Structure formats: structure tokens, C-alpha cells
Amino acid sequence: MTCSTSLSGKNRIVLIAGILMIATTLRVTFTGAAPLLDTIRSAYSLTTAQTGLLTTLPLLAFALISPLAAPVARRFGMERSLFAALLLICAGIAIRSLPSPYLLFGGTAVIGGGIALGNVLLPGLIKRDFPHSVARLTGAYSLTMGAAAALGSAMVVPLALNGFGWQGALLMLMCFPLLALFLWLPQWRSQQHANLSTSRALHTRGIWRSPLAWQVTLFLGINSLVYYVIIGWLPAILISHGYSEAQAGSLHGLLQLATAAPGLLIPLFLHHVKDQRGIAAFVALMCAVGAVGLCFMPAHAITWTLLFGFGSGATMILGLTFIGLRASSAHQAAALSGMAQSVGYLLAACGPPLMGKIHDANGNWSVPLMGVAILSLLMAIFGLCAGRDKEIR
């Protein structure tokens, strides 16, 4: 199974369905707890810092576990590694739902480990089985992840309020990994490519010394940083400019929808171009303009939120597509994915608290927002480098 043409029509559909369901699981189990954080904090009398750790802990798990995903896939194969990732997520959901604050944090960390494996391995799997459809399938699963984020946020509060409680609502999220496991069973049974030749395995270990790999990594990594800064602080930024909590919440939801929209458009564009430098720089600059607009013209926050959200979502899709396009093999793609996501999520975990401290020191959001704009300009430069039509050797 080295390319999409070697898959029968039925097997191809089942594989794509499995990929999209795994993508749904990776996002919905991460974002689903966010609307219940205040309820969880009250239930366990957590401090604000402890509550914030529930959001940061998965990001730290992503950063720590991501580099291990490619070696695991070389040892056990991508199919079985993804199956194990889904089992970890199921176990984490069960542990997180038990009545103990310690198990709440422990389960959250386990979920983060499972998500990290899945995040890293999906681009490699797409590179291996759909080498001529990397952009389209990456766009499809990115769009699926965006929709899943909205679904997770929308479903847990009604469940919690209608007899399930917050623990039951979080436990109900197990439906997603269980369905993904069911759809992934055929891939477990047809397990292939469990091992990689020694020379190619050694080749993937040198990924950290490749300038092109670092350009892809920093393009994705800076986007993760600026996205998590804005997604974390946008309501506070808007409220400081006179918006109501309801208005700020609506714009926060609009931001998440805007990040999903490029999944429909970017793959169509990428299908016709081999050199992605122009589009990579353009979407990164959209993020910069959005941040500057929020800083100096907050009255037009809808425009700036849409602009930033579309730019960041498009950057993520481009970055994930670069992983497949710039890697010369499926396992090198997994290694590059692990590198990019490890660095990216480490930056993402540090960004929101750092920008929060800068805000506290200055008393306003101007410096953090201009920091996001400058970082976005730097991201555009790395996009110009990563968008060249060449592979890592």
C-alpha cells in the first residue's frame, strides 16, 4: 500500500473515513472540556492557575510525546500506533471522568499523549497512502478538526445541564474514539510497513539538522504560538475595549469557525501550484494585519477576527501540507511532523502565559498584540523559505 492507486475503492473509502474520524477525535477530546472549566474549578475548588493547567497540560504532553511518535511508528507500524493512540485517549477520558482532582489532571495528560501520537502520525500516513492527494486530504481533515472543535464546545454544556453532570458530559466524548477505533479495525488487520530499513530510519533521525525542516517547523510553530495567544486572550482583549461578555464570546466562536474555513479553499489552490511561497507569506501576513487591527481599530473586531482566523487556519493547513510535500518518505514525514509539533506546542504552551504577564506589566493589550504581529511577519519569512518546491534530503 504505497500509494492511493493501490487501494481498492472500498478500502480507500474506509481508510479516508478512519482518518477523518481520528481527526475528529483528536480535536473534540481536546476542546470539549473548555466550556466546563468554570464548573470544574468550582467542583474541585481549583485556583485560576490550576484551572489554566488543564488547558496547558495537553500542550506540554504534545511537546514531550511528539518526538517519540516516529520511532514508535517505525517499531510497530503507523496503523497500530494510531490504534494505540485511540486507546490512550479512551483511557484518558475514563480516568478524567472519575471523581478525583488528581485523576482529572492525570487523565488529561493521558489524553494529551494519545492526541500527540495521532497528530504526528496522520500526516505521515497521508504521505504514504495518498502521495498525490496530500493537500486535498490534509485540507479535509483540517476542516474536520475545525468542525469537531465547534461540535465539542457545543455539546458538552447541554449534556452537563441535562442530567449527565460535567463528569458524565466529558465521559460521553468517548463515543468519538470508540467510533474511530471501530473504523480503524480494518487497518489494524491489514497492518503493513511495520518496520523501516535501517538506512531510512537513520535518515529520519537527521531531520533536526535540516534547514528546510526547521523552516517548516518554525512556520507551523509560530502559527501555533500566535493562534493560542489569540484564542486564549481574545475575549479579554475585546472586553477591555468595551465589548460585552456575550459579544466577546460570539467573536471567540467566530474565530474558531474562521480557522476551519480555509479547509475548503486552500487545497483547491494548492492542487494547481507546486511553489507555495506566495500563498504561505500571504496568509501569514493576514495574521499580522488581524493583530494590528485588533490593536488600533478594535471597533472593527469582526473583520480582524475573521482575517486572523482565516490566516491562521490557512497557515496550519499549509504547514501540515508542507510536512507531506517536503518529506521524501512517509516515515520522514512522521519524523518531521514530530519535530514540528513538538516545537510548535512548546511555543504554544509558553505563549499565552507570557503574553498575559506582559499585559499585567503594561496594563493593556497593545504590546502583546504587536508582539503577535511581529511574530506573524517572522512566520511569513519562514513561509517563503518552507514554500519552495523541494524535498528534505
UniProtKB/Swiss-Prot annotation:
Q: Report disulfide bridges, numbered on this chain.
A: none
Q: Does the keyword Signal apply?
A: no
Q: Which residues lie on this side of the membrane: Cytoplasmic?
A: 1-12, 74-80, 123-140, 185-218, 271-278, 326-334, 388-393
Where is it localised? Cell inner membrane
GO MF annotation list:
transmembrane transporter activity
Name the domain of life this protein comes from: Bacteria
Q: Which UniProt keywords apply?
A: Antibiotic resistance, Cell inner membrane, Cell membrane, Membrane, Transmembrane, Transmembrane helix, Transport
- Report the membrane topology from the UniProt record: Multi-pass membrane protein
Q: What cellular component GO annotations does this protein have?
A: plasma membrane
Q: What's its job?
A: Involved in efflux of 2-nitroimidazole.
Q: Which PANTHER family match?
A: 2-NITROIMIDAZOLE TRANSPORTER, PTHR23523
- On whether Phosphoprotein is a keyword of this UniProt record, the answer is no
What species was this sequence derived from? Escherichia coli (strain K12)
Q: Please give the family membership noted in the entry.
A: Belongs to the major facilitator superfamily. Cyanate porter (TC 2.A.1.17) family.
Please give a single GO biological process term from the UniProt record.
response to antibiotic
What is the protein named? Answer: 2-nitroimidazole transporter
Query: What transmembrane ranges does the database entry give?
Result: 13-33, 53-73, 81-101, 102-122, 141-161, 164-184, 219-239, 250-270, 279-299, 305-325, 335-355, 367-387
Please give the chief subcellular localization of this protein: membrane
Q: Which residues lie on this side of the membrane: Periplasmic?
A: 34-52, 162-163, 240-249, 300-304, 356-366
Phenotype upon knockout?
Mutant is sensitive to 2-nitroimidazole.
Induction section of the entry: Repressed by NimR.
